[in-house]
Amino acid sequence: ASLGATVVGTATSAEGAAAISDFLGEAGAKGEGRVLEVRDAAQIDALISHIEKRHGAPSVLVNNAGITRDNLAMRLKDDDWDCVVDTDLKAVFRLSRAVIRGMMKARYGRIINVTSVVGHAGNAGQANYCAAKAGVSGMSRALARELGSRNITVNCVAPGFIDTDMTRVLDEKQREAMLAGIPLGRLGAPADVAAAVAFLASAGAAYITGTTIHVNGGMFMG
């Protein structure tokens, strides 16, 4: 929004969507919040149709929805696997597919998928989440090859440990152990991730596609 884009953000509840609309309005930005359950294909189609009618075809898509249902593999239920993969991988494909036609017509597009450091490094107790995020990385490279001739780039941003509500509940011992594995010695800020996403959406990244920007303070280098 700070770069002048019209932003349509989604949330799973009406309250969340209203909060997005309020945030954009207070910032003087164009856009709105909308309710979306990303596992519902009909809702995805309805959302893209609404955006096209009200704002024009999307030129930038940021896939940032994600959930976890952690457990050791031997205890992981099929429903926990399916729910995470449907949300974190299948929905990314569906949303990407929904905007590709408009981007191809415009001969311009930016698809940016937020993955995770664990999709590259792995993490015990998160086989479903790791598989989904690794799948998004592979899919992104495939789409980059498919769509490059139409001036559509597809890239990933892979955050490490970010200072959010999820990490703030850790006790001091857990926090120290986490920081010990990060060469920069601190958690990332949401703004660090946002900056990488904004860069990939900018003209400065026009010749970058099929790659991943790692935002993890050095905890994974590859």
Language model features by range: what are they?
Residues A5-A19:
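Conserved glycine-rich Rossmann-like NAD(P)H-binding loop of the short-chain dehydrogenase/reductase
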Residues G148, T153, I208-G210, N216:
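Short, small/polar-rich loop/turn modules that mediate ligand/substrate recognition or access, typified
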Residues I182-V193, G204:
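A conserved structural motif in NAD(P)-dependent oxidoreductases
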Residues R101, R145-S149, A206:
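Alpha-helical segment proximal to the catalytic Tyr-Lys
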Residues L72-A73, K77-V85, M178:
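Substrate-binding pocket helix/loop in short-chain dehydrogenase/reductase
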Residues S116:
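Residue(s) in the substrate-gating loop at a strand-loop-helix junction
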Residues S96, A132, S140:
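Active-site helix of classical SDR
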